[in-house]
Amino acid sequence: MPELPEVETVARTLAPQVCGRRIVGITVLNAGTWQGGTAADEVKSLTPRIRGISRRGKLLLLHFGEGGPDASGYEEEISVPTSAEQWPLFYSASGMEQGRLELEGEKPETVTGLAFHLRMTGRLFVWPQGTAPGTHTRVIFDLDDGRRLFFDDTRKFGQVRALCGRELDKWNFWRELGPEPLEMIPEAFASRFSSRKAVKALLLDQSVLAGVGNIYADESLFRAGIRPGSRGCDIAPERLRSLHKALTDVLLLSIRECGSSIRDYRTARGDVGAFQNSFFVYGRAGELCRTCGTRLESARVAGRATVFCPKCQQD
């Protein structure tokens, strides 16, 4: 499943292609993909202009609105800050901007954007005018310049949802999302781990932190030297602050590498990520630790396959 770095990368590679364009047509090819109480035809009737793109947890958000530059001819890929202090971010036709775009309009029924949950195999690609949908295309968005934005999803677990005040109030997943790890100070981060649950289970819990999945939980715990099954409440505050730094570092490193491509993930330009080449533990059970040479072990933590080094991760 695409995690925070992968969704962030899709956002920054999609923005130069679609920001400033209007959506003039929507075709839903798989009814189960379009979720919520606002129909696709209702969104299409607005011919909304894509003002910007942002991310919340593992969700990619298209924001509607007037004003700002047009995306015509803008092909530069947006660079990403290397410091967590520069977040939150959103991407527009003029490039990368700081701040947060609002999703709730003055009226609860005002549609202010779209949310894409990529889940296991969701992808977003822009194609030339007249391109026919593929076998796994679930929703087509026709843009005012003739190009087409396809939401492809092999497994059909992904979702698209129109956003407005009335929808956000009813969407439990949205209301329960925890804070963004790249926007937290170490003390606030550490305070989220007072539970008796395993620290990895807490990292994966989207109500504790938004956007972290199996890859970056394993990688950050290794870098912090913490055993995945350790109870959150048993870990000293200074160790949790180390985990905060490790998680921040690994997320930013992965974003700079355009995420991790293991099976299905691609950027919005069709490129593969490269961070999988830097894994210390994820997917490497039985191999030798790159730090100490000990054979890596595997276990089930929070119902997920987990890889760790028994020597480097002692807590």
Task: Label the predicted regions.
Residues 91, 99-223, 231:
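Phosphate/anion-contacting hairpin/loop surfaces
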